[in-house]
Amino acid sequence: MGSNQDFRNLQAKFQTSQPELGELFRKTPKPELNKVLKKFPQTELSEQPKKSSQSELSAVSLKPLQLQFADLPRKPPQPGVLKKSPQPEFPHLANKPVQAEFPRKPLHPEFTGLKKPSQAEFTDLKKPPQPQFASLPKKPPKPEFGELSKRPPQLETPQEPSAPPAQKLLKPEPNNPARPLGELKPKMFWHLEANEAPKRPLPSESSTFPKKPLQPEAVVGFSRKSQPQSESIEVSQTSPSKCGSRELDSHSPQPDISTFPKNNENFRKPSYPQATGCPKSPKQPMFYEFPQTPPRKPESCNPQSHSPLPDFNAFPKKHPQLQPSDLTRASSEPEVCKVPKKTQKPDPNVLSQKPSQPELGHLPRTSSDPEFNSLPRKFLQPQHGKFFQPEFPKGLPRKPKLPGSVSECSLPSASAGSSPQCPLSPGLIVPGIPRWRSEDFQVQRPPRRRPLPSASSLGHPPAKPALPPGPINIQSFRRAAATAAAVLKTGSSTGTHFQAQQPQHIAQNPDEIYELYDAVEATDDSSISPRGRDEMLSTQQATRWPQQEPELRKKATQPQQLPATDPKLLKQIRKAEKAEREFRKKFKFEGEIVIHTKMMIDPNAKTRRGGGKHLGIRRGEILEVIEFTSKDEMLCRDPKGKYGYVPRTALLPLETEVYDDVSFGDPLDMQPFPR
């Protein structure tokens, strides 16, 4: 209970400062208020306290506010009465509302700060509650009231409690019921008060704004009760609705109770009074300057009705709420009638100002209920969410009228959910989608083709062109095709230069061609760019293809298979070419060299050196079979490019070839032997 400790600290501070400030305020407000009371009617007095309260509100000084309050209202007589017997009077009222006593006990530890400020501020029945909030007003109100209220006997009653016992009982009773009703409400809304209690005692302890509404209440009492000046002043806090008649006072202890709990509730429950008191707070637009007076009436509604639901249902339902209240609704109704007669009309306007009033009073809204009540009913409906559903079915009959597609129906539903009050008209949605579909159909349809012209309009077909003059040289076409391919590959001036010289190279002998290869090999590979190498290959290919000799064709394929960039490969190629020439001379081999198959030398075979027309045998070496010369020997070529005879006994067919030739028999057996 941090709030209780803070409250106690403030009590000690205020008690220490009581005599000084009390003396100052006693001296200053007495002459002013006495003069005002003598010269002007209480209505004017009510205006002066309002002005002074406003100035004090701006200053946010709690002590001067209480002093003026004490000066203006009826507090001193009541404190006198309560000093003698504050608790015994409470049991008097306890007979009427038994509930008040029960909540009071638990509430004092929990809401001690709340109850005491309400008593000190509104009723000032006890001096100890006043020092808690501001000990200043206790002392000044006594002399001031002694001076101010010379007319009413009630002012004298505090000094002489036996003179009007009935009135004393009535007055203390309203003061005490103020607590019980405030406590009745804690029973009703115990949790909310417990939550809001620390907040309310804090403003009461700081005595910043909770005391401000006290002034408006006192002012209200003066303005309302101008005829029974002193009596109405004393009783006004108990029930400002009283017309100053003591008969009403006899019946109004209960309504006074309601008024006091209203004040107590202002500190305890700013949220509920505002939430449920939305209808009643507008009735008190006169207290725009004093925010607690509007919540005080709504608070009175809450303790009386014991349920904020009737207030939520309708703002203007003031009388039905007053009816269920057994205690004070009779008194609260006259209060409403007298105080806000002028303001009952601007109720709708006041609704907008209610949130500002709690801000002035610094009464926090701890519940969302006041927010719903402050809003007009039109806005309440969408918030509750119950009225969205009837609006949706209204819009639904329009939706099925839309073209029957799931996507189309979904679009209006989504948009209607965002703004149910303005359902989308089908006219806005329908035309867009069908247009889209029509466009899609048009796009899907193939474009119209123009009809072909008739054969008669075209006439006879043109005649074929004449053949070129002279004999046709087919090789020239081949050369042209080769040059075109070379141009496409190279695309450079050097390539075209070599192509222009191609016919001369073709006419040259094969030896000259080999010399060309030698010249190419002599150049350093590093000096040749990639483009230059490609050009050289293209020129070589162009020169070889036109030749009809099979040997040249075979030789031409080798450089294609092996990249010419590697100098080692080039050397091997040249050696192979020389070996082939020697082979042709030695074996007198004519025709094209064709590789029939490849065979491997048996790894178990005996090795031997080659000599004469025989190749050397090396285990596991693969040889290319060029000719099946006899049953014993075959003409082969080794990987080095040498040619010679190899005995059949040393050769083994490759596994791949064996599987490929299984169905056709051994190719060696099928090969006819030469004679």
Curated annotation (Swiss-Prot):
Basic and acidic residues bias locations: 23-35, 141-150
One matching Pfam family: hSH3
InterPro entries: FYB1/2-like (IPR043443), hSH3 (IPR029294), SH3-like_dom_sf (IPR036028), SH3_domain (IPR001452)
Keyword Phosphoprotein (UniProt): yes
Keyword Hydrolase among record annotations: no
Gene Ontology molecular function terms on file: lipid binding; protein kinase binding
Tissue occurrence: Expressed in bone marrow and mature neutrophils. Weakly expressed in macrophages and mast cells.
Knockout or disruption consequences: Mice are healthy and do not display any obvious abnormality. They have normal hematopoietic differentiation.
Biased composition (Polar residues): 1-19, 43-58, 224-242, 251-264, 322-331, 407-422, 537-546
Record's keyword terms, sorted: Lipid-binding, Phosphoprotein, SH3 domain
Chain positions covered by the region annotation Disordered: 1-473, 523-562
Cellular component, GO annotation: plasma membrane; protein-containing complex
Modification note: May be phosphorylated on tyrosines.
An example Gene Ontology biological process: regulation of neutrophil degranulation
Residue ranges, compositional bias (Pro residues): 462-471
Record SUPFAM superfamilies: SH3-domain
UniProt note: domains: The SH3 domain binds to PtdIns(4)P.
Subunit text: Interacts with SKAP2, LCP2 and DBNL. May interact with LYN. Interacts with NEK6.
PANTHER family assigned to the protein according to its UniProt record, in alphabetical order: PML-RARA-REGULATED ADAPTER MOLECULE 1 (PTHR16830:SF11), SH2 CONTAINING ADAPTOR PRAM-1 RELATED (PTHR16830)
Purpose: May be involved in integrin signaling in neutrophils. Binds to PtdIns(4)P.
Name used for this protein in its record: PML-RARA-regulated adapter molecule 1
Organism: Mus musculus
